[in-house]
Design a protein with these regions (language model features):
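Noncatalytic, beta-rich nucleic-acid-contacting surfaces in large DNA/RNA-processing enzymes
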Residues: 1-239
Length: 239
């Protein structure tokens, strides 16, 4: 698991804090919307912070300026091929909510938390359920087909999404009052996105580790960096 070494670093940093200050930190009970920690991410000075150490991520965090853990989760999800194309739109919507445009009213409750952008696989499932009347099972099958790039399945489901499938109990977008061109546009965006998308639970698990490392670095930099450097030194080749 990618974060396994980082979990060890966090555990050792907590031990260092206990040793140096007599403070018993419970990382599950820290404030996960501490503005000082979030502001530190927005500076781009994120060396040693899980998932945010690359030059590209540092630059993205400076643009994003996360104000909540939700922003961190979305940021980790967006910084990937495919979803990365939505980054300018996401940042614009975050900073200027008046610029957000929803292709149809049904999208607003699904995409409002992510500033009008599709960010998670779960949102694709919600869209096809809300706009076209897909069942939960059918929407999950479509999500899998998109992630595996099964073009024949995606094209078949496009017909059901836009025009419906009466025999299978799918009303479709047009029957639900959504324009045909708009429905096809939404479907195209879902295909482009879903090929590379994270599910939210996966991104959230990473973001929690990201935040914990940022919290420790901000409040206990000596103890955290000592734990981090020790973890690196033990993996270096011995001569």
């Amino acid at each position: 698991f990618l974060g396994l070494r980082t979990l060890t670093v966090i555990n050792n940093a907590v031990k260092n804090v206990k040793k140096n200050y007599g403070i018993s930190l419970d990382m599950q009970k820290i404030d996960y919307n501490d503005q000082k920690v979030l502001d530190s991410l927005g500076t781009g000075r994120t060396d040693g912070v899980f998932q945010l150490e690359s030059g590209g991520m540092k630059g993205f965090m400076k643009e994003l300026k996360p104000h909540s853990l939700e922003d961190v989760i979305a940021g980790i999800s967006l910084y990937r091929p495919g979803p990365m194309d939505f980054i300018p739109q996401y940042i614009r919507g975050k900073n200027r909510p008046d610029t957000i445009h929803y292709d149809c009213p049904q999208l607003e409750p699904i995409l409002k938390a992510t500033h009008g952008c599709i960010v998670y696989q779960e949102q694709v499932m919600q869209i096809v359920q809300s706009l076209a009347g897909f069942t939960l099972g059918r929407s999950d099958l479509l999500r899998r087909a998109m992630s595996k790039k099964k073009l024949n399945v995606m094209e078949k489901e496009r017909q059901a999404f836009v025009y419906g499938n009466e025999a299978e109990g799918v009303p479709g977008c047009i029957k639900n009052g959504i324009d045909e061109k708009i429905a096809n546009k939404i479907y195209d965006e879902m295909i482009d996105f879903a090929q590379y998308a994270f599910n939210k639970s996966h991104a959230a698990a990473y973001a929690y580790v990201t935040y914990q490392t940022a919290f420790l670095k901000y409040y206990y930099p000596v103890e955290y960096m000592a734990a981090l450097m020790t973890s690196v030194s033990t993996s270096l080749p011995r001569f």
